[in-house]
Amino acid sequence: DCDGQMNLTRFYLPEFDPAVNYSMASLLMGDGEPVWEDNLVPLEPGLNLIPGSPDLYNLDLDAIKDGVSAPENVRNFVDCVREDDGADFFIFDCPPGFTTASVGALMAADEVVIPMLVDGFSFAGTQDMAQQISNLRRANQGVRIAGVLITQWHNSDVVRQGEQLLRSMGVPVFQQTIRRTDKVPE
């Protein structure tokens, strides 16, 4: 969980206390456990989590203040896991901005899925993200956009037109969408 808001962590681990447990912030600061498996919280067989932490916000502030950032620690962690054949894939839940943790995730990623609500701000954000991923290829030549995943889709003219516009932008778009439902916020 690369987001200081910790929604993914709170969903899976409502009682998680980042003050006494390792987190993505620990990993980025180089304070994680030396054995990669000890940084994971097992959720189910084959599903593990490196929890988020509000310390991720402090990490970004420290990086600005001190000019020190360690996003390569995420790539080093992923490389260690891959060397041991310890995971089939990684999913990094990132905030909608370029934080230290999200840059670390992008440096370690092979493919990026961009979830997108069809609205004007999201089109600009998707274009910005595509450009940033292109720029990031200097540090990670293998990263590419797997596709944009349209979220909160519903059958309306505005959404259908937005979807057509998105498909004309030259960014891959998944055929599958995530429908809008009132049940999720409840």
Question: How should each PLM-predicted stretch be described?
Answer:
Residues 1-186:
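P-loop NTP-binding core
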